[in-house]
UniProtKB/Swiss-Prot annotation:
S-adenosyl-L-methionine binds at N19, L21, G46, E71, D94, N117. This is Ribosomal RNA small subunit methyltransferase A. One of its GO terms (cellular component) is cytosol. The lineage of its organism: Bacteria, Pseudomonadati, Pseudomonadota, Betaproteobacteria, Burkholderiales. Specifically dimethylates two adjacent adenosines (A1518 and A1519) in the loop of a conserved hairpin near the 3'-end of 16S rRNA in the 30S particle. May play a critical role in biogenesis of 30S subunits. It comes from Burkholderia ambifaria (strain ATCC BAA-244 / DSM 16087 / CCUG 44356 / LMG 19182 / AMMD). Its EC number is 2.1.1.182.
Length: 276
């Protein structure tokens, strides 16, 4: 596989984190994993040169119910419009600022399926942005750096368990689906990749906790991950009765389960409300 940054006459742009998928066997496996069906409301983030776009459109799109795609590179937008016409509705812009809820069906029922080969340089911020639309989403399938996927699905007590693990596991059921080697791309990235499936919990399955408050607490806990929680969560000791919660501060952030973090965030919310 050539290391050239040019593919199909387009130069991959480093600032957009572009690595184009070119292995047709891998593409077929990804599409099979996604399982698109006619009439579904699907959004592709970063369609690039259309490697996934084409088989997705073949499986689900009609002029009345097109595949939606969010693309930042205006050079690619023109090519995609010309190639796919009314079967692809393109939204020019940055996925980090895009309102995905605007593409959902009317009503409260989740309707969006979101897919994409996400730019690795913005993957974590984009995953957090997408969390704000989780109630409108049926599922998500993303190509990501393998290291990021391993962190997403990591168990407590492992080195890979992180702030990303806690926040995403609170909101989604996640599963690593496929490994994708560098030679599947043009130009080949310097890292291994993987496909992850993310299914949001339904409202009745979610714990009653403020996600902003949970994020505040988890960020503090992991701010110095080699230190004990008595240090990183020290500012909360006057507010929260950790002993009463049975929460051991003589641990590191990676040793605490998602449920325990949720419990502490709930206790913090109750104390702050009582102090109002």
């Amino acid at each position: 596989m050539s290391n050239s940054r040019q593919h199909q006459g387009h130069f991959a742009r480093k600032r957009f984190g572009q690595n184009f998928l070119v292995d047709h066997g891998v593409i077929d496996s990804i599409v099979t994993t996604i399982g698109p069906a006619r009439g579904q409301r699907m959004v592709e983030i970063g369609p690039g040169l259309g490697a996934l776009t084409e088989p997705l459109i073949a499986r689900l799109a009609t002029p009345e119910s097109p595949l939606h795609a969010v693309e930042l590179d205006r050079d690619l937008i023109g090519r995609l419009q010309q190639r796919f016409g009314p079967l692809l509705e393109l939204h020019a812009g940055d996925a980090l600022a895009f309102d995905f809820r605007s593409l959902a069906a009317p009503g409260d029922k989740p309707s969006l399926r979101i897919v994409g080969n996400l730019p690795y340089n913005i993957s974590s911020p984009l995953l957090f942005h997408l969390m704000t639309f989780a109630d409108a989403v049926i599922d998500q399938h993303f190509m990501l750096q393998n290291e990021v996927v391993e962190r997403m699905v990591a168990e407590p007590g492992t080195k890979a368990f992180s702030r990303l693990s806690v926040m995403l596991q609170y909101r989604y059921v996640m599963e690593k689906m496929l490994d994708v080697p560098p030679e599947s791309f043009q130009p080949p990235p310097k890292v291994d990749s993987a496909i992850v499936r993310m299914i949001p919990y339904e409202p009745h399955e979610l714990p009653d906790v403020d996600p902003v408050l949970l994020g505040e607490l988890v960020t503090a806990a992991f701010s110095q991950r080699r230190k004990m929680l008595r240090n990183t969560l020290g500012d909360y000791r006057e507010t929260i009765d950790f002993d009463g919660l049975g929460f051991d501060l003589a641990r590191r952030a990676e040793d605490v389960s998602v449920a325990e973090y949720v419990g502490v965030a709930q206790a913090l919310a109750a104390r702050r409300k009582a102090a109002e």
